[in-house]
Amino acid sequence: MPKRTDLETILIIGAGPIVIGQACEFDYSGAQACKALRDEGYRVVLVNSNPATIMTDPNMADAVYIEPINWQTVEKIIAKEKPDALLPTMGGQTALNCALDLADHGVLEKYNVELIGAKREAIRMAEDRELFRVAMGEIGLDCPTAAVAHTLEEALEIQTRVGYPTIIRPSFTLGGSGGGIAYNREELIEIVGRGLELSPTTEVLVEESVLGWKEFEMEVVRDTADNCIIVCAIENLDPMGVHTGDSITVAPAQTLTDKEYQRLRDASIAVLRKIGVDTGGSNVQFGISPTTGRVVVIEMNPRVSRSSALASKATGFPIAKVAAKLAVGYTLDELKNEITGGLTPASFEPSIDYVVTKIPRFAFEKFPQADARLTTQMKSVGEVMAMGRTFSESLQKALRGLETGKIGLDPTGLDLSSEDDIATLKRELKAPGPERLFYVADAFRAGMTVADVYALSFIDPWFLDQIEEIVSHEQQLADDGMAALDAPRLRMLKRAGFSDARMAQLIGSNEESVRTLRRALKVRPVYKRVDSCAAEFATSTAYLYSTYEDECEALPTDRDKIMILGGGPNRIGQGIEFDYCCVHAALALRDDGFETIMVNCNPETVSTDYDTSDRLYFEPLTLEDVLEIVELEKPKGVIVQYGGQTPLKLARALEANGVPVIGTSPDSIDLAEDRERFQQLVDKLGLKQPPNRIARNAEEALVLAREIGYPLVVRPSYVLGGRAMEIVYGESDLARYVRDAVKVSNDSPVLLDRFLDNAVEVDVDIIADKDGNVLIGGVMEHIEEAGVHSGDSSCSLPPYSLSPQTQAELRRQVVMLAEGLNVVGLMNTQFAVQVNEAGDDIVYLLEVNPRASRTVPFVSKAIGMPLAKIAARCMAGKTLAEQGATKEIVPDYYSVKEAIFPFAKFQGVDPILGPEMRSTGEVMGVGRSFSAAFARAQEAGGIKAPPLGKAFVSVRDPDKQRVLPVAQALVERGFTLVATRGTGAWLQQNGLSCEIVNKVAEGRPHIVDSIKNGEIVYIVNTTEGRAAISDSFSIRREALQHRVTYSTTVAGAKALVQSLEFRGTGPVWSLQELHKELEA
C-alpha cells in the first residue's frame, strides 16, 4: 500500500554518544531515515545528544534537538512539537529503551503518539530474554537451554541444570554489557552480580554453553504485506562465545550447504513473524553445532543494528532508508532499488559476486589493565571492511585497512622453535584475543595441521584452509625471492590479497621496488562496482572496490575532481568527528560543482554511504591503494586534513609521488609536528611554550628533566589521542617510564614538557583562506585543568571564566600562528592559561594541529556555522569573504561538551583522567548560563545527580585550598561531609564539620566498605603521582561499579556541584531556534 497520509510529523530518537557496542552505524541509519522521510514530505523531528553526528545537522530534520535521551526530556519535546508518530528503530538500544520508557510512563498515550516500525510488544518480546525463549518454543525453534534469574540464588540453582561453562546475558543492556562466561562458581557469582546491577530490569539469562559452535546472522527486511527478503547472510569466522561485534565476519556465508541456508532463511522469517516486527529491518543470530548440526536461535534485534549497517555496505541495499519508508506504509515492491537506477524493485533479494570481510578494531593498548580475552561482552571500538573476489583477497585487504601496523598476516614475533612459545601459541588459539588470526597463521608456520588448529580454535576448517594457503604462498615467495616474480605470479599473489609492502618484506626488498616492478609488468588493479545484483543489471552508482582481474568498471569522467581521504576504522582518539568533517567536505564541494571522490574502509559511517559523494572507493587507506586510485581518477586535489592521523601520515609520501595535496602543505603539517622546527617558529613569533626538551636516549632524559624541573609530561613524538603519555612527578617515575613505557631512540625520541599545574586549558578552532584571512570558529574553555587530554575534558563555548583580555590575547596568537604556518583550511590550537604570582594570566602554547580537530562538529553546532564546509571551500580556492564568513559568532547561550567513557566495559581499569585519551564519544548540553548548560550535558552523559547524603572528599595537598568552596557548597546544599584524615583535618580547621574515615591501607572499616554499603552518594578524589593513584584506585573502581557519581578533578567537582539546581529544569530548544537567535 502507498504511504500513510494520516501522519504529518514523525519523531526519530538517535543513539546518543558513541560507546562500545553502539557507534557511528546509527548516525548512518538515522541520517538515512531523516532523508527518506523528508523526501516523502513528512515533517521530521530528531532528538540526539551527540553533536558529532551528521543527523544532528540543522538541515537534516525540520527540528533538531541536541538534548539528553531520557523519557523526561523527550516528553518535553513531544509536548512542544506534537508528533503523530515515533520511529524508535534507528537509534540502537538507546532509542528502543527510551521508547519503552515513554510507553510505560503513559507519555505516548497522553499525547496520542503512535509507535511505528516496531510495536511495544515486539520490542518487549525480542528484548526480554524469557519472553523470547517462550516465543521460539511456540514456533518450534530451538534455543540454548536457559532460564531467567532475578537473584544470585536463582542463578546458582539454574546453573546446576545447564552445567559449566555457563553463559550469562543481562536483559536490555547494550553490546552484552555485564555478561560473560563463567567456568566455575566464583566467576558465576561475580558475573551474575555485575549483570543484575547493570540490567535495568535486574534480570539475567543463565544459559547452556554453545561455545565453539558456528555462528550466523541473517539480515531480514519485512513489510506490511508480509513480503520478506534476506538482504544478506553473514558468517562469523570466530565461533560462538565471541560477541558478534568482536568477531571477524564474512558475507556472504561461506560454509553453509544450500539446505542449511534455506533452513536458516525460513527460520529467520518465522522469527520476525512471531515477534511481530511488522516492518523494517531486523537481524537474527543462529548457532549451528559443527558435530550434530543442531540449530539454535541465539537472539534477534527488532531494529537496524551494527550488522545491518555492514549488510547495507556489503550489498549496496540501504536497509535503514528502506526500513524508514516501510514504517510509513510502503511495501517492498513499491520501492525502487536506487543502485540499479530503479531497474529493480526493493523486493529483489540482493546477490553479490564478491566476498566481504569485516575485522573489528580494538583499543586494548589504551587499557593495559583490561582483560583482552574476547567473550560475550563486546570490547571492540571500531571495524574495517574490505571487498575482494576471493576470501583471501578481502581478508588481507581488511588486515591492512585496520591500521594496527600490520601489512598482511604478519608473524606474531613468537619463536616457533621454542617449546614455551608454542605453548603460548596454543593458549592464544584456544582463548580468543584480538590477535588470534595472526596466531592461526603462526600455527601453520610452525607446522601444525588444519585439524590441530581446529581442535584448539573451532574456527571452521574451510577458513583455516584459506589461511594455510596464504602462509604457503608466503613461504614459497620468501624461498624464491624477487627474481621469481614474473607477471603471472605477481597477478596470482595480488589476487590472494598480498600488499606490495608484504611481498617486499618477504623477499627482503622495499615497497617502492615491488611497486616499480609490478607497474613495469603491467600488473594493475581494476575496479568493480557494487551493484546488488551480481552484474545482472547495469548500475549508474559509482560504488567501487579493487581487484586483480581483466575488466575495469570504474569508467572515470573528465570533470574537475576533489578526492577526500577518510579516517579508516574508529578507534579511541579518532572517531566519528573526523568522518563528520569528511562528509561535510564532500557535500560542500559537490555543491560547488566538483566531482567528489571518497576513499574509506569503515562500514559504519555516513562517508561510506554511496550517495554522500559522487564516487566511493571502499579501499584500505594505504599508500599503495590510494596511489592506484589517484592514477586512475587524476583528481585536481586531494584532501588529507579531514580524516585524522590516518591520511596525514600519507601526506608526505603522496606529495613525493606527485599527488596534488590541497589545503595546508605537507611541509607545514610537518613543521607543526616536528618539535625542533616548531620551536623556531614559536620563538620567531615571540610566543611562550612550557619549558621542554627532546631526549634521544634514557640517560639523556633524566639529565634534561633536571633542567626543566618536575612535574613533567612525557610522551613519544607523533601520536594521536595521547598514546603512551604520562605525567611524572619525580626521577624514579621517569626512569620507569623510559624503561617500560617506550623504546627511546634517535628515530623515536621522547618529548619532555614542564607540566603546568592548575592551569586552565583552552582550545581554539579557526579557518584560514589562501589570502591569509582568518575566521575564528570558537574559543572553548576546558573544565578539567590542563593535564587531562583535551579529548577527555569537558569544555564550554563561550569560555565561562576567562577574562575578555585573555580571550583577546588568545585570538591574537592564533592568527599569528595561522599566518606563520601558511594554513589553508582548518587549524586547532591548544593553550594553557596560568595565573602568575602577580595575579596576571600567562598564556602558554601547548600544541597546534593544522587539520580538522575533534571539536569541529561541536563548534559548528554551537555557533551555527558549518566550519568543515567553509574550510573545504577555502582549500578548493575560495576566500572567506566570497563565502560571507568573515566574523566570529559568539552566542549568548552556553554550549558544553562532555566526554563519554567505556570504563564500565573494562573490569580492572582505573577511571582516573590523565593525558592519554580514553573517551569513545561525546554529548552536548545547551543552557542560558554555564551551570545550566553543564547540568544538561551531565544529564545527557548519563551522569546522575547525587541524591542528598554523605559526600566523600579526599584531595592531594595542592588542591586543599581549592576544594574548600566545593565542600562549602556541598554543605549549603544539605550534604554531610566524610573525608580521609589529611583532608578532614583541613576542612575542620576551616570550620567545616566532617566525619573521618580510613583510607584502604589504614585498616577497616574503610572508605571502600562505605561505598559498598551504599553509604556514599558523591565522591571528590584527586591524586598525584603513581603510588597515590594506585592507592586510591579501589575507591574510583568501586564508585563505578556501584554507580556513585565521582569527580577526579577539583574543577570538575566545582562545576558539577554548582549545576545541581539546574538538573531537569528549563525548556528545550531546537538548533533551528538557537541559530535563529544568532542571526538577529
From Swiss-Prot:
Q: Where are the annotated segments for Allosteric domain?
A: 943-1080
Give one GO term, molecular function aspect. metal ion binding
Q: Region (Oligomerization domain) spans which residues?
A: 404-554
Region called Carbamoyl phosphate synthetic domain, residue ranges: 555-942
Carboxyphosphate synthetic domain: annotated segments: 1-403
Which amino acids does the record list as binding Mn(2+) 3? Q830, E847
- Quaternary structure (record): Composed of two chains; the small (or glutamine) chain promotes the hydrolysis of glutamine to ammonia, which is used by the large (or ammonia) chain to synthesize carbamoyl phosphate. Tetramer of heterodimers (alpha,beta)4.
Q: What is known of its domains?
A: The large subunit is composed of 2 ATP-grasp domains that are involved in binding the 2 ATP molecules needed for carbamoyl phosphate synthesis. The N-terminal ATP-grasp domain (referred to as the carboxyphosphate synthetic component) catalyzes the ATP-dependent phosphorylation of hydrogencarbonate to carboxyphosphate and the subsequent nucleophilic attack by ammonia to form a carbamate intermediate.
Supply the name of the protein. Answer: Carbamoyl phosphate synthase large chain
